[in-house]
C-alpha cells in the first residue's frame, strides 16, 4: 500500500512538474497477478487496480493490518468497474461474473475477496475505489443497462459526452462512495469544461481507452492558479476538494470518476465560468 498525504493548495501551487506528479498522479494502476493500492489521506479514499492473468488475486489480511482493523472491508465499502475482459469476483463464497463495463458494489463487512479472469489472453482489469463506511448495504452487480446515463455538451465545444452513473443514489444505496464512467464521442476532446470544484467532496479520475501515442492534459489547481498533469492510458489522478478537475485529450478517451465526502448529490458543484480561470 502506498500512502499519499493531503496537501494544502498554497503548497501545491509552488510545485514543479515532478512535484505535481508525485503528489497527485497514480502512475501504475494495473500490474499482472497482483493488486495495486494507493491510500490517500484526502477523505481516506483507496484507489487501485487488479489484473489477474495466470492466477487469481485476493486481498488478504495484510491490508487490514495496515488499516488498523481485522480485514480490508471491516469499516469500508468497495466499488469495482471492469474495463478488461470477462472475469469473476468472489465475495465471501458468492461468485459474481463481471464482464466488460460491468461493476460490482461490495458492502461494508465483506471478509474474503478473490478476483479472477476467465481468459488469461484477455484478462479482466478491475479498477476500484474504496471508502470508509458506517453500515452495510447489499452487494450488487451493475450492468451498463442499469446505469443512469446523462449526455451533455456539444460537438461545437468539443465536449459531447455521456456520463454513465453506476454507483449513485438513484441506482443503489452506498454509504458515501459514488462512481461512474464518462465516455467522449469520437472527435470530442474536453471533459468537464466549463469546470467546477466541489468543496464538500474529493474526486479521483482514471483515464483509459487511449491510444499509446495519445495523452490527456488533466487540468487541476485552484481556479486562479491552474496547473496540468499529462496523463497516459490507464493512469489515475487525485483531485482535492479545492481543485478543478477537467481534461483535454489529443483524441477521444474514456474515464472513470469516483467521489467521496460530505454528500452524494451529483449536482452539488461550485460552477466556474471559463472567464474566471487563470
Curated annotation (Swiss-Prot):
Stated role: Catalyzes the isomerization of 5-dehydro-4-deoxy-D-glucuronate to 3-deoxy-D-glycero-2,5-hexodiulosonate.
Organism placement in taxonomy: Bacteria, Pseudomonadati, Pseudomonadota, Gammaproteobacteria, Enterobacterales
Pathway info: Glycan metabolism; pectin degradation; 2-dehydro-3-deoxy-D-gluconate from pectin: step 4/5
NCBIfam families noted in UniProt: PRK00924.1
UniProt GO BP: D-galacturonate catabolic process; D-glucuronate catabolic process; pectin catabolic process
Cofactor remark: Binds 1 zinc ion per subunit.
Binding site for Zn(2+): 196, 198, 203, 245
Protein family per UniProt: Belongs to the KduI family.
Record key words, sorted: Isomerase, Metal-binding, Zinc
Entry's EC annotation: 5.3.1.17
Gene Ontology MF terms: 4-deoxy-L-threo-5-hexosulose-uronate ketol-isomerase activity; zinc ion binding
InterPro entries per UniProt: KduI (IPR007045), KduI/IolB_isomerase (IPR021120), KduI_N (IPR027449), RmlC-like_jellyroll (IPR014710), RmlC_Cupin_sf (IPR011051)
UniProt KW Signal keyword: no
Native species: Edwardsiella ictaluri (strain 93-146)
Catalysed reactions, semicolon-separated: 5-dehydro-4-deoxy-D-glucuronate = 3-deoxy-D-glycero-2,5-hexodiulosonate
Designated name of the protein: 4-deoxy-L-threo-5-hexosulose-uronate ketol-isomerase
Record Pfam families: KduI
Cofactor names: Zn(2+)
Amino acid at each position: 500500500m502506498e500512502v499519499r498525504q493531503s496537501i494544502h493548495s498554497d503548497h501545491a501551487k509552488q510545485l514543479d512538474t515532478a512535484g505535481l506528479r508525485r503528489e497527485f498522479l497514480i502512475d501504475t494502476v494495473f500490474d499482472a497477478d497482483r493488486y495495486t493500492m494507493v491510500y490517500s489521506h484526502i477523505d481516506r479514499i483507496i484507489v487501485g487496480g487488479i489484473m489477474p492473468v495466470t492466477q487469481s488475486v485476493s486481498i488478504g489480511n495484510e491490508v487490514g493490518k495496515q488499516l488498523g482493523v481485522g480485514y480490508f472491508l471491516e469499516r469500508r465499502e468497495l466499488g469495482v468497474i471492469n474495463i478488461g475482459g470477462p472475469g469473476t469476483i468472489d465475495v465471501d463464497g458468492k461468485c459474481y461474473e463481471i464482464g466488460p463495463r460491468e461493476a460490482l458494489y461490495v458492502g461494508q463487512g465483506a471478509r474474503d475477496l478473490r478476483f479472477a479472469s476467465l481468459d488469461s489472453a484477455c484478462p479482466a482489469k478491475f479498477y476500484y475505489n474504496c471508502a470508509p463506511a458506517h453500515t452495510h448495504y447489499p452487494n450488487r452487480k451493475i450492468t451498463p443497462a442499469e446505469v443512469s446515463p446523462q449526455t451533455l455538451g456539444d460537438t461545437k465545444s468539443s465536449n459531447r459526452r455521456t456520463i454513465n452513473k453506476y454507483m449513485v443514489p438513484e441506482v443503489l444505496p452506498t454509504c458515501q462512495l459514488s462512481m461512474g464512467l464518462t465516455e467522449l464521442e469520437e472527435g470530442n476532446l474536453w471533459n468537464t469544461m466549463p469546470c467546477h470544484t466541489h468543496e464538500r467532496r474529493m474526486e479521483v479520475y482514471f483515464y483509459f481507452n487511449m491510444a499509446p501515442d495519445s495523452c490527456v492534459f488533466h487540468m487541476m489547481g485552484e481556479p486562479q492558479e491552474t496547473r496540468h498533469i499529462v496523463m497516459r492510458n490507464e493512469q489515475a489522478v487525485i483531485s482535492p476538494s479545492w481543485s478543478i478537475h477537467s481534461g483535454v485529450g489529443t483524441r477521444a478517451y474514456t474515464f472513470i470518476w469516483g467521489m467521496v465526502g460530505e454528500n452524494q448529490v451529483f449536482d452539488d458543484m461550485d460552477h466556474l465560468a471559463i472567464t474566471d480561470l487563470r
